[in-house]
C-alpha cells in the first residue's frame, strides 16, 4: 500500500524524494547510529532524553508533537477527520473511508511537515508552524506552475482551493509581504 502511495503523491521530484526517504527509513536515528558506531548513547537528538527510535524522532517526541498538532488542527479546519496515527503521515496508509481528494490534500500537508522535521533533524528545537506554512506555500506555488504547464488545473483546484484560504488566513501581513504571498487561484 505504501508503494502505491509513493507513486502517485506528486509530480514534484522534491516532494517524491522526501516521501521516499521517510517511507524507506533513509534518515539515521540515534538508535541506528548507536548500532553502527557502537556508542552507548541512543537518546533522542531533539534533546528530550528519550530513546531515539524512528517513530520517536518523527512522531512521539515532545518537540515534534506541536507541529503534528498544528497539522491536525488544519485538517479539522478543512473538515477532514483522521485519527492521529503515525502510519498516515509517515507511510501514507490511510483508512479506507478517506476520499482520494482528501488523501491528496493530506499527503501534501504531511510531506511539508516531514520536510520541516527533516530540515532541523539534529537541532534541539521545535519545528514551527510558520516554517510549515511557508513550505506548504512553496509546494502550492510549484504545483500551480506544474498544473498550468501540464494543463491539469482542475485537479490542482480540487486539491488546493480550501487549503489556500486557510494558509492565507494564518500567515501574517508581514509574512505575506516578505515572501510575496498572494492567491494564485483567485488572482488577488
Predicted regions: what they are:
Residues 1-188:
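Family-specific functional microsites
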Amino acid at each position: 500500500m505504501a508503494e502505491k502511495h509513493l507513486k502517485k503523491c506528486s509530480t514534484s521530484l522534491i516532494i517524491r524524494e522526501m516521501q521516499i526517504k521517510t517511507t524507506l527509513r533513509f534518515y539515521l536515528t540515534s538508535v541506528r547510529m548507536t548500532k553502527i558506531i557502537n556508542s552507548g548513547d541512543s537518546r533522542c537528538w531533539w534533546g528530550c532524553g528519550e530513546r531515539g527510535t524512528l517513530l520517536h524522532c518523527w512522531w512521539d517526541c515532545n518537540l515534534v508533537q506541536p507541529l503534528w498538532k498544528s497539522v491536525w488542527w488544519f485538517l479539522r479546519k478543512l473538515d477532514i477527520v483522521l485519527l492521529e496515527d503515525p502510519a498516515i503521515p509517515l507511510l501514507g496508509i490511510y483508512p479506507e473511508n478517506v476520499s482520494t481528494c482528501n488523501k491528496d490534500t493530506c499527503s501534501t500537508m504531511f510531506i511539508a511537515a516531514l520536510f520541516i522535521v527533516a530540515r532541523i533533524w539534529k537541532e534541539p528545537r521545535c519545528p514551527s508552524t510558520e516554517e510549515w506554512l511557508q513550505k506548504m506555500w512553496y509546494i502550492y506555488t510549484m504545483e500551480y506552475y506544474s498544473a498550468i504547464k501540464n494543463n491539469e488545473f482542475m485537479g490542482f483546484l480540487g486539491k488546493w482551493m480550501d487549503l489556500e484560504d486557510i494558509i492565507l488566513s494564518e500567515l501574517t501581513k508581514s509574512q505575506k509581504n516578505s515572501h510575496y504571498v498572494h492567491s494564485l487561484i483567485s488572482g488577488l
